[in-house]
Design a protein with these regions (language model features):
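Flexible, glycine/proline-enriched loop segments at strand-loop-helix junctions
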Residues: 1, 22-28
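Conserved metal-phosphate-binding beta-hairpin within the catalytic cores
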Residues: 60-62, 119-151, 161
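Phosphate-binding site of ATP-dependent enzymes
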Residues: 29-106, 110-113, 134-141
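Short amphipathic alpha-helix with an adjacent loop that forms part of the alpha/beta core around
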Residues: 2-7
């Protein structure tokens, strides 16, 4: 997020570390927005900053099985907002989810390899969800590992599971 001249490169993403469901996640485009957002977020949470990567947002559900790691179908996220933030997740009509994600087979294989490796390297156990972005060159960027992903009617893991006829009890 800082170039060779020690200048902040915009746009970037500001995320609180203490919230779920993308509460407080912001796309920052200018120095003024950055300064205002930092003042606001410092009062409620520690935070981290990452570069904004334009591309297709996806998420993958993974679980360890006896013979390795099982992956659910990749879920594609198409939002009308600039980023998949709280508003995009919970406002009807703002986001369309596609299962399986509309990506080519080569990219799908790469996503599964990268996410499975992250699951393994991080020592994940049980069910988790890994969020990523695929840029215009089909490069995969991992954004987040969710070891306690949502399990509501509108959550991602149940949508992925349902697409392969896996149902969860209430």
């Amino acid at each position: 997020i800082v170039n060779e001249n020690n200048k902040i490169v915009f746009p970037l993403i500001l995320k609180p570390i203490s919230n779920g469901s993308s509460v407080g996640v912001s796309l920052i485009k200018t120095k003024k927005e950055f300064e205002e957002a930092i003042k606001k977020i410092e009062k409620i949470s520690d935070y981290f900053i990452e570069p904004y990567i334009k591309g297709k947002e996806i998420t993958v559900g993974l679980v360890r099985e006896n013979n390795g790691i099982f992956t659910l179908p990749i879920l594609g996220i198409n939002t009308k907002n600039e980023i998949y933030d709280y508003d995009a997740k919970y406002t009807p009509g703002k986001t369309e989810l596609e299962v399986p994600a509309k990506i080519d087979k080569k990219t799908e294989k790469k996503v599964i390899e990268v996410c499975s490796l992250a699951y393994e390297v991080l020592g994940c156990e049980g069910l988790c969800r890994i969020d990523a972005i695929i840029d215009e060159n089909n490069k995969v960027y991992l954004m987040e590992v969710n070891t306690q992903g949502g399990m509501t009617n509108t959550s991602d893991i149940p949508a992925m599971a349902k697409s392969v006829n896996i149902e969860f009890e209430d």
